[in-house]
Amino acid sequence: MQTPLRVVFAGTPAFAAGHLTELLASEHEVIAVYTQPDRPAGRGKLLTASPVKAVAQERAIPVFQPLSLRSPEEEAALQALKPDVMVVVAYGLLLPKSILDVPAFGCINVHASLLPRWRGAAPIHRAIEAGDRETGVTIMRMDEGLDTGAMLKIAKTPITVSHTTGTLTNELETLGAQTLISTLDALPALLDQAADQPEAGITYAHKISKAEALIDWSQSTANITQKIRALNPAPGCFTVLGGQRIKLWEAITVSYGAVTTSAPGTIISLNKEGLIVSTGDGLISITRLQLPNKKPLSIAEIVNGNPDPLSPGNQFGSHL
């Protein structure tokens, strides 16, 4: 490794905090942390520090929480730190050119996809939702575009049918942190070898909206199971029965192209193995759900309790 770098770290959620923790265990020096301002959180809506700020405070690292980086004052504050590089992981603020140009080696970003596929805010969700078989992390030198910078390093990992956004995020956090450190260890050489992103294969991972969480039972079994996994743990998919919302947390495919005469959304059967529901092209087995005002339960637990709302013949709605 070359001489340890003076690093400014910019990030906000737990995913970024994992990267910061790994960076603090490396030979590189974290001289300051940038993160989003404290936000109201929890039932009491108390101002709460971001996970990244919490890690920084534990290590007595200076924390900056600007509302914007577009002022001359913010540029001057960053210049005063004399950083070699700025590492950005799910920060949440746009970096103008005046900021990108301050560090000696520029700003690098850890993005949770194999660019140029899934540029944007929700790459992990969208990869699962689309049925991708593979994803990973891309380390890029940032420019003024949306995840358009030259690529320094890529690390890949498979997506299985058991992955949710929650579990895959945890795996990519570990992979991303390891890849970040190895990138910083060889940064000058990697910058010289940086590769432009290909023009082919560009897709955008738009932010998840709450409206997307409502299951459309006319969709294919594959699309529905992928969506349930993609929106777990947040915001969580739901369906409607008797005017009430039922959250769907886990589901598996019963069969592709299974023949059924029941309308999409119809409950076919219920036993301890699963709740069988018709879809646009077959059947799906819901194995974990959450009834109104209840905690999430396995279907076996529901069968042992009060399964009345889930009687065969009832039909889930696709509209509020």
Regions found by a protein language model. Name each.
Residues 1-43:
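N-terminal Rossmann-like dinucleotide-binding module
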Residues 26, 36, 85-204, 209-211:
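Donor/substrate-binding cores of folate-linked one-carbon enzymes
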Residues 6-8, 29-33, 62-81, 86, ...:
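Internal alpha/beta domain cores that form substrate/cofactor-binding pockets in large enzymes
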Residues 218-320:
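An anion-binding loop in the catalytic cleft
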Residues 39-57:
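N-terminal beta-loop-helix "entrance" segment that forms/cooperates
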